[in-house]
């Protein structure tokens, strides 16, 4: 959770009001080749998306993932993301908390087969 405070900071401060917010957070940016947004060099994973549509009445937006970048330091010997190395966190909107990700609780595309019979 090395960058928790820095990520929170750049999310709550407007670049229109604080021009050096990345520098203040200790981040360095690289221009994306896929979307009109910066990539934060210090973060291990970037999921780059383009907006497909947005409904202002419900605040629901749909996006399309156009690129995923992963730092080699968080890959395992098979080239897959090692979640323990990446140490991702998620935002809990119900409680305004950040939570650590990582405990395996099941097998995707497999556990549900028990109900098919």
Predicted regions and their residues:
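Basic, polyanion-binding surface patches
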Residues: 1-117
């Amino acid at each position: 959770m090395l960058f928790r405070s820095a990520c929170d900071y750049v999310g709550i401060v407007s670049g229109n009001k604080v021009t050096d917010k990345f520098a203040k957070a200790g981040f360095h940016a690289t221009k994306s080749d896929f979307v009109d947004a910066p990539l934060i060099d210090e973060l291990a994973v970037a999921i780059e998306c383009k907006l497909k549509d947005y409904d202002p009445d419900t605040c629901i937006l749909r996006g399309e993932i156009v690129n995923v970048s992963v730092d080699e330091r968080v890959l395992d010997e098979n080239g897959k993301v090692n979640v323990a190395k990446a140490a991702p966190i998620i935002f809990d909107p119900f409680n305004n908390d950040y939570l650590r990700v990582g405990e395996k609780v099941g097998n995707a595309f497999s556990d549900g087969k028990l109900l098919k019979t």
